[in-house]
From Swiss-Prot:
Residues 1-20 form a transit peptide. Residues 360-437 form the KH type-2 domain. This is GTPase Era, mitochondrial. It comes from Rattus norvegicus (Rat). Belongs to the TRAFAC class TrmE-Era-EngA-EngB-Septin-like GTPase superfamily. Era GTPase family.
Length: 437
């Protein structure tokens, strides 16, 4: 499959496909009038794509208008770096992505590296923050819990420094994992990622008044077991708080009044530094860490505190610059063209699942099975994707299709736009909803 053409964001075409009834998965049959749902296999397709007229050139950089890592490997001439975006695109080809992941890193003379684990309760905003730090929305995000089902990896490469982000599922207890029949990866991945971490970012959603005043027992257990790993505290979604004084109380509670081994004068720090990066405390208390309470609700070993709104990108760059400064001399793990370890098919499936979680009620999105049946180049050079969405109940079929097919059309259109932003190419997506038998 040749690489799809570069897309033009201003030209997006959405077509609602025909209603389909029949047992032939590869064909489209129009249903009889007045019989939208019968006793056959039901499915509805929605096609969303974009068109762009222009020549298909030889190298990826000329096609995409960006610096292609594979072009650098193959020796293609590169455009002026000042005219191209810094964030690499993800290849639409699995083989190219895998080749890039195992390719020898193009390290500078003095490389620096940092492995960062994002830790927090479910739905704290870890994936949203990861996307903001990376500069592309490669990780799925929704308001429902357990959107991230397994550990995902993102890579930030700037000049001599490479920061590797490990976006883990929300940390849960074994009891909850068994009770809700959740994947074992939701329980194990946060702990496994800590074994190779250089820095831990603990994320707390301050908009949740029920959980914001204390770290979860699972997070505290993880921090305690890996206490040798440096950690920082990030208070997320601070823009949701009407009374900023609440931040002072939360900071004191979540740090037990101690940051970087010193007593934290929260009020003085907040008055002297109105920015969202709280400076280290002023006076030292060497005996603070000697007491370990079994009822601990905070962690007194955080090196720094950051307050930000990941959704609005407020002060995310401040955190990013801090991470870059914490990198230590060492070899890079990935080529500078790597943005994520996910395959293009995984990114697509996760993006579709993100929209299902966002728009479908209650348990419905968790019952949907996804199956990609087409991933190929279209007649105009676009990336053509077809994915079947299998649901167990007729009522779920109707919910997912929506009135006159508007919901499935909206989902396909939004996913297509997200994929075009990630792959930097035309995307023609077809979603078919079918009753699982």
């Amino acid at each position: 499959m040749a690489a799809p053409r570069r897309y033009f964001p201003g030209i997006v075409r959405a077509l609602l496909g025909a209603w389909q009834v029949g047992s032939h998965a590869g064909r489209e049959w129009v249903s009889p009038p007045g019989s939208l749902l019968g006793n056959h296999v039901r499915c509805v397709s929605c096609v969303v794509g974009a068109t762009f007229s222009g020549p298909l050139l030889a190298s990826a950089s000329s096609r995409y208008g960006q610096d292609s890592a594979l072009d650098r490997i193959l020796g293609f001439p590169q455009p002026d770096s000042s005219l191209v975006p810094c964030v690499p695109a993800v290849s639409v080809h699995r083989d190219e992505q895998n080749l890039l992941l195992v390719h020898t890193p193009d390290m500078p003379e003095n490389p620096r590296v940092l492995r960062v684990v994002l830790l927090g309760a479910p739905n704290a905003g870890k994936s949203t923050l990861s996307n903001q730090l990376l500069g592309r929305k490669v990780f799925p995000v929704s308001k429902k819990v357990h959107t991230t089902r397994c550990q995902a990896l993102g890579v930030i490469t700037e000049k001599e420094t490479q920061v590797i982000l490990l976006d883990t599922p929300g940390i849960i207890s074994p009891v909850k994992q068994k009770r809700h029949h959740l994947e074992l990866s939701l329980l194990e991945d946060p702990w496994k990622s800590m074994e190779s971490a250089d820095l831990v970012v603990v994320l707390v959603d301050v908009s949740d008044k029920w959980t914001r005043s204390r770290l979860s027992p699972q997070v505290l257990q993880c921090l305690t077991k890996f206490s040798q790993v440096p950690s920082i505290l990030v208070l997320n979604k601070v823009d949701c708080l009407k009374q900023k004084s609440v931040l002072l109380e939360l900071t004191a509670a979540l740090t037990e009044g101690v940051v970087n081994g010193k007593m934290l004068n929260v009020r003085q720090a907040f008055r002297s530094r109105p920015s969202t990066h709280c400076p280290g405390p002023e006076t030292e208390d060497p005996n603070t860490h000697a007491v370990r309470s079994p009822q601990r609700t905070g962690w007194p070993y955080f090196q720094e505190i950051f307050m930000l709104s990941a959704l609005n990108n407020k002060d995310v760059n401040t955190l990013k610059q801090y991470l870059l400064t914490q990198a230590q001399p060492g070899p890079w793990e990935f080529h500078s063209g790597v943005l994520t370890s996910q395959t293009p098919e995984e990114i697509c499936a996760n993006k579709i699942r993100e929209k299902l979680l966002e728009y479908l009620p209650e348990e419905v999105p968790y019952s949907v099975q996804q199956k990609t049946v087409i991933w190929e180049e279209g007649p105009s050079g676009e990336l053509v994707i077809q994915q079947n969405l299998l649901v167990p109940k007729e009522s779920h079929v109707r919910i997912l299709i929506g009135q006159k097919g508007l919901l499935i059309s909206q989902i396909a259109q939004e996913v297509s736009q997200d994929l075009m932003d990630i792959f930097l190419c035309d995307v023609l997506l077809r979603l078919s909803v079918k009753l699982l038998k």
